[in-house]
């Protein structure tokens, strides 16, 4: 089962079209009990990196910051597929902090992509 946490305001503004998927639930609130049991906090922007309208201000309201990460378990990590909008979707202290594994994630992605490219050569 996968739980996806997002914000009701974003959903109501139809920024996303959520598909109907089996075993997936959408939760519109951040529950401290769930944060405390999370293994990973991952964020990404679902709009163009070039958008300069009101979506930028909307992002800041839901930024992953140190206060949110402090509510997670000691072993929880922060992930992002990069590039990140630092100061809008994630704070500088989180993305560069001890719980962040974004650079390891990027390195693993490069290795996987090289493997796919090598496989496609055959």
Feature locations, PLM:
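Glycine-rich, N-terminal phosphate-binding loop of Rossmann-like dinucleotide-binding domains
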Residues: 44-45, 82
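Short, well-ordered secondary-structure micro-motifs
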Residues: 14-17, 53, 114
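Donor-nucleotide binding loops and adjacent catalytic segments primarily
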Residues: 4, 11, 66, 106-107
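Adenosine-phosphate binding glycine-rich loop
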Residues: 75-76, 82-122
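A short, acidic, amphipathic alpha-helical segment used as a generic capping/interface helix at domain edges
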Residues: 30-34, 60-72
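Glycine/threonine-rich flexible loop motifs
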Residues: 45-63
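Hydrophobic/aromatic residues located in beta-strands of well-ordered beta-sheets
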Residues: 2, 78-79
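Glycine-rich phosphate/diphosphate-binding loop of Rossmann-like nucleotide-binding domains
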Residues: 1-43
């Amino acid at each position: 089962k996968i739980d996806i946490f997002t914000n009701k305001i974003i959903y109501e503004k139809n920024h996303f079209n959520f598909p109907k998927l089996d075993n997936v639930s959408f939760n519109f609130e951040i529950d401290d009990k769930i944060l405390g049991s999370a293994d990973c906090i991952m964020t990404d922007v679902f709009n163009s990196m070039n958008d300069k309208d009101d979506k930028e201000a909307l992002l800041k309201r839901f930024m992953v910051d140190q206060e949110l990460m402090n509510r997670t378990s000691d072993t929880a990590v922060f992930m992002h597929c990069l590039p990140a909008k630092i100061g809008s979707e994630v704070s500088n202290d989180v993305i560069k902090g001890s719980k962040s594994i974004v650079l390891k994630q990027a390195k693993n992605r490069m290795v996987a992509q090289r493997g796919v490219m090598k496989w496609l050569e055959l």
